[in-house]
């Protein structure tokens, strides 16, 4: 989120960490993820919403027709989620880029991840990280990572349909749309 704020506040674009990449990218600043519960027979969306609440989101998002967390609250919620992942033994590496993936036959014609190769963006150092499980939260614009996975023989499947865009508005416009004549009032 730090680099995303850097773009918005200082107009400094970090091409490797911005509104589309990293923590704070790939849709963090959008409530679309809160509405994605259509055709959800296993109620996974509800479980995800509960994770948001457990991390500090307002409990009303569990029952409101149009749930909204708010940008400033959402940043803290995502930071709390990161801390929980780390507490549970997960590892999150900022300022690192995936540059290689080590796969080995799993015995059933499938492949198993054995290691990741990452490069530190601050000094260029390359690290090999042994692992058997990986979660890559890529967003939609990590073309270099998709190419790397494809070239390594990792099975990839496109979503059936996806369209999106981001329209940015001054906060004062959003406040007026949401709060009407009360926009700008200190308690709001």
Regions found by a protein language model. Name each.
Residues 1-29, 33, 37-51, 55-188:
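Residues forming the flavin
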